[in-house]
Amino acid sequence: LETAFQDVTNVYHCAALVSFHKADFHRCLQVNREGTANIVNFCLKHKVEKLCYVSSTAALSYNSNGLTDESFKWIPGPEVSGYSISKFAAEKEVWRGIEEGLNAVIINPCVILGPGNWKESSLSIFKSASKGIGFYPSGSNAIVDVRDVVLSMHYLMNAEISSKKFLCTGP
């Protein structure tokens, strides 16, 4: 990473391990929290102008009374996935960086869909549906087009906005 950060002005941190398997909990935590801590530290060291961290709505607490927004405080519970815990822990690393002087924004997209690999992404639901495999997921999830996420990230990086987080969901 040392070489990658030479002469970099803006960083879009989108990398994460996405898994909802209990066996992947420690790996998710390591990749997502420690990876983000490394990115934050390099941004601070190399005086990056701005960081956009892509988190997830999974890092927000569930609101049993209606819609969730950015102000919800994290309340872990037995139904919270390891992925959710890892993304929340990664967000805490970004907030640490902000406290240390990093100019950063956090975007929390819901389930992202768009052109891509139907085998290893959220698009796998379409692969199942195309084979006639019916399903109905429990709970509720919003979806957003990947192009809308990218436009939102671009806007946030070019706006005079810092030290805030934003939900990014579809219509």
Positions of the model-derived regions?
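NAD(P)H-binding glycine-rich loop region in Rossmannoid oxidoreductase-like domains
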Residues: 1-34
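Conserved cofactor-binding/catalytic machinery of classical short-chain dehydrogenase/reductase
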Residues: 10, 35-38, 50, 89-90, ...
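Conserved catalytic-site region of short-chain dehydrogenase/reductase
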Residues: 20, 57-67, 112-118
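Conserved Rossmann-fold NAD(P)-dependent oxidoreductase catalytic core, especially the SDR/UDP-sugar
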Residues: 26, 34-83
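Catalytic helix-loop patch of NAD(P)-dependent Rossmann-fold dehydrogenases
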Residues: 30, 65-106, 111, 134-135
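NAD(P)-dependent short-chain dehydrogenase/reductase
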Residues: 100-143
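Alpha-helical substrate-binding/gating segment
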Residues: 126-135, 139-171
